[in-house]
Amino acid sequence: MSSAPRRPASGADSLHTPEPESLSPGTPGFPEQEEEDELRTLGVERFEEILQEAGSRGGEEPGRSYGEEDFEYHRQSSHHIHHPLSTHLPPDARRRKTPQGPGRKPRRRPGASPTGETPTIEEGEEDEDEVGEAEGFRAPPQQPSPASSPSAVQFFLQEDEGTDRKAERTSPSPPTQTPHQEAAPRASKGAQTGTLVEEMVAVASGTAGGDDGGAAGRPLTKAQPGHRSYNLQERRRIGSMTGVEQALLPRVPTDESEAQTLATADLDLMKSHRFEDVPGVRRHLVRKNAKGSTQAAREGREPGPTPRARPRAPHKPHEVFVELNELQLDKNQEPQWRETARWIKFEEDVEEETERWGKPHVASLSFRSLLELRRTLAHGAVLLDLDQQTLPGVAHQVVEQMVISDQIKAEDRANVLRALLLKHSHPSDEKEFSFPRNISAGSLGSLLGHHHAQGTESDPHVTEPLIGGVPETRLEVDRERELPPPAPPAGITRSKSKHELKLLEKIPENAEATVVLVGCVEFLSRPTMAFVRLREAVELDAVLEVPVPVRFLFLLLGPSSANMDYHEIGRSISTLMSDKQFHEAAYLADERDDLLTAINAFLDCSVVLPPSEVQGEELLRSVAHFQRQMLKKREEQGRLLPPGAGLEPKSAQDKALLQMVEVAGAAEDDPLRRTGRPFGGLIRDVRRRYPHYLSDFRDALDPQCLAAVIFIYFAALSPAITFGGLLGEKTQDLIGVSELIMSTALQGVIFCLLGAQPLLVIGFSGPLLVFEEAFFSFCKSNQLEYLVGRVWIGFWLVLLALLMVALEGSFLVRFVSRFTQEIFAFLISLIFIYETFYKLIKIFQEHPLHGCSVSNDSEADSSSNNMTWAATTLAPDNSSASGQERPRGQPNTALLSLVLMAGTFFIAFFLRKFKNSRFFPGRIRRVIGDFGVPIAILIMVLVDYSIEDTYTQKLSVPSGFSVTAPDKRGWVINPLGEKTPFPVWMMVASLLPAVLVFILIFMETQITTLIISKKERMLQKGSGFHLDLLLIVAMGGICALFGLPWLAAATVRSVTHANALTVMSKAVAPGDKPKIQEVKEQRVTGLLVALLVGLSMVIGDLLRQIPLAVLFGIFLYMGVTSLNGIQFYERLHLLLMPPKHHPDVTYVKKVRTMRMHLFTALQLLCLALLWAVMSTAASLAFPFILILTVPLRMVVLTRIFTEREMKCLDANEAEPVFDECEGVDEYNEMPMPV
């Protein structure tokens, strides 16, 4: 026999009787890595494969040389008095052992390096040890002793082994032949344990839980193996957890067979090495070893992950919902987790007195709490990608990690676990009268008690009463893989409450929750913390206020004596998790340092306020500005991240290429880009928009479109009636309500069927009304036929439109800046306001006020006047009909007209303000505000109808589809003249007014299209500037043949139409602005609105009841509301305001006050010039004067003001308005006339 000693390879080897010290040369060598991957998931099925293989493996390598390390290891392992591990185990915790097979190939230990430094454990070498230990189970066993009893020693299992191990216990094992094993004498020290070895082998013949375990003929080869496959993480246990007297399931540092050959000191050393985790003293580093893959390639196998390897957890960041729970006492003085705050984007706190949610606000944190949080994260437990599916499983792992990291004592494990599993309550629970949402830990345990794997009895659960003074009680948490989730009994399910549904609407669909648990407990001597990121987000029952899957958990417990504010630290981590950059870093973190780096980045962009008393909110204005600068700096730093963190190009070549691609994409999407070919822009519009033609009708199948039809109908009908009545007054009923309604209907239908942007609403506007009045005055003063002149203007309009579209002249709209738009809008608003009071003064002149008199003559005159009024009001046609003189000098007419005008204005204006108020729910406010003008008209008509003895002038509307004045005109206008031949020179000279009309239509239509097509509105189907302009102008030219008015894109009505079809996202965090989800870009709503406006001719009897004074009130309303959003109007206010009261806006902060006032004075001068032109006989040329402001701004103003000042004073800062801000609506979005 060879004298070379041999160290025991595994516990399976040492369970045998002494064997020969030398092996035959013919024994095949042990392949080191052949079964490495499979043995990582070593289970019952795998053992059956191994045990059924023929032949034995092992043997020493030929020529194996032994060094001093091997001799020292042999001396330490076999030349001492050893006590079998079974002496430390309770009688009921024994289990059958597996005999030893032939020796395996000796291998050099990865011992200390020659330099004396701590060696590094190679994972491949760890795996080879495990493979070698498993090979020992293939040895021929010894016959068992029938006198032994079955044992129940269990070992720590991986989660995947639980099911396999249970299946082994419940299935019988087929018998196999027991080959003969040769025995050999051993050394004297080894002989002392011979009896114990035989006893252990005899004990190993039993089965775990079977009655026939002691049968003499029971083969040993099917015994439950004592070996298990483990990973390095499962060694992380302290030595106190391995004491058999303190654990229900004994924990041993190694296999029993190997343990019996080791002394007590060796076992203690092994326990300390494998289980304890002493802070500051770490064991060998574990690094990846490529030996396994190279060995697999050498043997012809495909290298790949082992079956035990799990895929990397998905780290894609999601939206976040954070809930802060604090440990508090309920009304029964029982501890519970009480929700005190939540974060969707901003912080919402629960008011203590009223138990309701406060207003969302930006969280303000103390600097010390952030530093304390960073310190606790640096020293606390951090568990990333924890693979648990239930709260008890998570709590168990957290508590074990706290014990391992020496944050809590072992005896505090039960108390901390009990605290983690306390009941969770929320402010909304008390408002619900259905089944309680929270299930206590005890009731949950009673529900789960009927679903144990054994079916009869179960191990202790965390839900059973925990006695803090009994440290030997082991707490078992059922793993989800071992137990199916218990089905809830009938009656425990409930529907979501209104509060939950409302809150879920504000949370994004893919959001994942963060649960923050903080509180004071007196059984701890120092604070303990744990930060957990689950491998997959799971819904934890009765934890959150709403059913949102949980991905992160943060726990902070400690005594009240600690110098630490747990509430503020909880708010700090909650605010950090609600921060976009930090929670993205938390998703992508691989270790603790990544979290600490993210906290430092958060601190770099935080604002610290000095501890000084703030007397007013205006002192904090600079904070918001400073914060915006910090955020801008943070975004710029984010662009400089290394590759992989973003897609930002780094090289100059990549940046240039990206810039070229962006420019090319922007140019391709720009509808105003010139192609250089005749009608090139028109062709591009058709190719861009018409492919979506069928979808324009399919997208209208939505209830929101039906609501928009009703709303836009009244929004379009009210201006048609108002402008129609005023146009009839200006043109002596040559063009009135009926013509305007018919023109709106016909042109609206055609445009919705053929237009490129069907969201535009075609209608009459104030600038066109001003031009119609000026042209009518011009024709009347020159004895020309007004309607015939309009026909020739229409002819020239068509030619001008064709020429403009052929030359792709729509790009000229870019040169119409805010400077010109505001002058134009301000002029039209002044005209509206002026005309309103001018008409009212005229009524007072026609119907003067009378003093009180008691004379009979006065009474007689009054009676005659009343009789005259009565005959007038009772006549079939109203007083304004053609062929009748309006009555004059009627009593109380002027006062009633004033009341009707003022009442209409104030009701419409108040309802507009009411839309953005805080009364009633938002939906009701929006309905009332959107229908403010029709409601005001209806109320004032009822007031006028109820006053029967006072005359008021009514709207002139014919019966049926007839022109307003049938005795003056018909439906078709003769271009050569109706009553007298039209002069030829005027046919040619009509080109000049045609140019002026074209300027007005061009500006209104193209600027409105620009506003609708802003990128903030997220339109997908595109617009068509050239096609829309050609359609609108061509339809106006054709309609002039029928005596119908010209129309243009109405700015306010178009923006209102687009807003009505905009779908806002419901998942809006409290305090955040809503975002556009989609826009229903379709043609049906505009088509139906146009048809309904045309059918409004059938309600002529109702329209004839509308007093003109009511229309004057609407006129005043449009003039006043049009001033909102005009920066010129706001800067006029600043002329009378001290600089210290100026608002905090760009053109005030970036431009000196005198320079700003100079710019305002220049705009005021241009406005005065336009007003002077309007007041003279040359009023027809006001569009030409208006267009001259464009070169004035481009040539003159650029010489007076710097480029920076012009950008501040003439920038278009208006953004689409979708949310409900007080005093803000569609009128604030555009500096264009109504």
Curated annotation (Swiss-Prot):
Residue ranges crossing the lipid bilayer per the database entry: 705-728, 734-771, 791-813, 823-843, 894-911, 927-947, 981-1003, 1029-1050, 1084-1129, 1156-1192
Biased composition (Basic residues): 76-85, 94-110
Modified positions (N6-methyllysine) in chain numbering: K271
Activity regulation: Inhibited by 4,4'-diisothiocyanatostilbene-2,2'-disulfonic acid (DIDS).
Reported tissue expression: Expressed in the parotid and submandibular glands (at protein level). Expressed in the gastric mucosa (at protein level). Expressed in the choroid plexus epithelium (at protein level). Expressed in the liver and gallbladder.
Alphabetical UniProt keywords: Anion exchange, Antiport, Cell membrane, Glycoprotein, Ion transport, Lipoprotein, Membrane, Methylation, Palmitate, Phosphoprotein, Transmembrane, Transmembrane helix, Transport
Gene Ontology biological-process entries: amelogenesis; bicarbonate transport; chloride transport; digestive tract development; negative regulation of CD8-positive, alpha-beta T cell differentiation; negative regulation of CD8-positive, alpha-beta T cell proliferation; osteoclast differentiation; positive regulation of enamel mineralization
Basic and acidic residues bias (residue ranges): 39-49, 58-75
Keyword Transferase found: no
Single GO cellular component term: apical plasma membrane
Residue ranges with Acidic residues bias: 120-133
Entry-listed glycosylation sites: N856, N866, N878
Membrane topology: Multi-pass membrane protein
Compartment(s) where it occurs, according to its Swiss-Prot or TrEMBL record: Apical cell membrane; Basolateral cell membrane
Predominant place of localization: membrane
Segments on the Cytoplasmic face: 1-704, 912-926
Oxidoreductase is among the record's keywords: no
Region Membrane (anion exchange): start-end pairs: 705-1234
Modified residues (Phosphoserine): S113, S145, S171, S173, S240, S440
Lipid-modified residues, S-palmitoyl cysteine kind: C1166
Sequence ranges on the Extracellular membrane side: 844-893
Family: Belongs to the anion exchanger (TC 2.A.31) family.
Function: Sodium-independent anion exchanger which mediates the electroneutral exchange of chloride for bicarbonate ions across the cell membrane. Plays an important role in osteoclast differentiation and function. Regulates bone resorption and calpain-dependent actin cytoskeleton organization in osteoclasts via anion exchange-dependent control of pH. Essential for intracellular pH regulation in CD8(+) T-cells upon CD3 stimulation, modulating CD8(+) T-cell responses.
Identification of the protein by name: Anion exchange protein 2
Native source organism of the sequence: Rattus norvegicus
